[in-house]
Curated annotation (Swiss-Prot):
Keywords: Protein biosynthesis, Transferase
Superkingdom field: Bacteria
Database matches in Pfam families: Formyl_trans_C, Formyl_trans_N
Protein name, per record: Methionyl-tRNA formyltransferase
Position of the signal peptide: none
Gene: fmt
Length: 315
């Protein structure tokens, strides 16, 4: 059998487009691309194609944008392409069991964690939120469960103390295509060795919410600093002062010990705004008031020092 596979690609955001780009540079043949319908975006709410659609159009690949793959007529779109395998990366639609069984080699998925840790919607963010020392990418054979399929390939990635969801996303978007190409080669050769996930090690990466982004001063400084990095670039951590929401882009944990009530400002200068927490002190260094650009603590103190006087309480 040839090492070249007939592939259907299903994906939507930039993370997926980077994987499609790697496949387009490989020996494999992309016979069709499935992506989410165009969505309103930007100030004018103009209908905007997904990054995957844009890339597919540049390469004249047939594009399909069903709202669901449950209707039988939409499932025929998959069957008629006669693919060897379907590669799914952040597609955003559920694949019914009948679709999973259509390609000769089934469907595989690129997931942004070391499964079985962080199954679900937000694995990159939750790995930071939990203070994990490492994460990575798992290529798995898809089944009807939520990220429950057998694992085909893993690549690990250390999480650095300064990593945010944005930087970790970029790292995994580079590792994922590498792992995908290795996995496809193994499947083409018949040398893949599926590994069953250990159910005892499963954790779930719940979807992020805007409500979760509000800094809870009853948590420790360590946990709050993790939240700030995990929620960058979305939904972005924030606190409220003088009824104004202030986004927080960067902060650090100080070794300082302070007995002030959580949420109390204990010091503010050009090096940061120091806030007492349930355990430790958080030094906030980059902030963004509503309607303004992100700025240093020094710049915000120059214009709004009254917000950050000693003893003020942040909500």
């Amino acid at each position: 059998m040839s090492d070249s596979l007939r592939i259907i690609f299903a994906g939507t955001p930039d993370f997926a487009a980077r994987h499609l780009g790697a496949l387009l540079s490989s020996q494999h043949q992309i016979v069709g691309v499935f992506t989410q319908p165009d969505r309103p975006a930007g100030r004018g709410n103009k209908l905007t194609p997904s990054p995957v659609k844009v890339l597919a159009e540049q390469h004249d690949i047939p594009i399909f944008q069903p709202k669901s793959l449950r209707p039988e007529e939409n499932q025929h779109l998959v069957a008629d392409l006669n693919a060897d395998i379907m590669v799914v990366v952040a597609y955003g639609l559920i694949l019914p069991a009948s679709v999973l069984a259509m390609p000769r080699l089934g469907c595989i998925n690129v997931h942004g964690s070391l499964l079985p840790r962080w199954r679900g919607a937000a694995p990159i963010q939750r790995s930071l939120w939990a203070g994990d020392a490492k994460t990575g990418v798992t290529i798995m054979q898809m089944d009807v469960g939520l990220d429950t399929g057998d694992m085909l390939h893993k690549i690990e990635c250390d999480i650095q103390p300064e990593d945010t969801s944005a930087t970790l996303y970029d790292k995994l978007a580079q590792l994922g295509p590498q792992g995908l190409l290795v996995t496809l080669q193994q499947l083409a050769e018949g040398s893949a060795q599926p590994e069953v996930q250990d159910e005892a090690q499963v954790t779930y990466a719940e979807k992020l919410s805007k409500e979760e982004a509000k800094l809870d001063w009853s948590l420790s400084a360590v946990q709050l600093e993790r939240c700030i990095r995990a929620f960058n670039p979305w939904p972005v951590s924030y606190f409220v002062v003088d009824e104004q929401p202030i986004k927080v882009w960067q902060a650090q944990v100080l070794a300082t010990v302070d007995n002030a009530a959580p949420g109390t400002i204990i010091h503010a200068d050009k090096h940061g705004i120091q806030v007492a927490t349930a355990d430790g002190v958080l030094n906030i260094t980059q902030l963004q008031p509503a309607g303004k650009k992100a700025m240093s603590a020094a710049d915000l103190l120059n214009s709004r020092r009254e917000w950050f006087t000693l003893g003020n309480q942040l909500a």
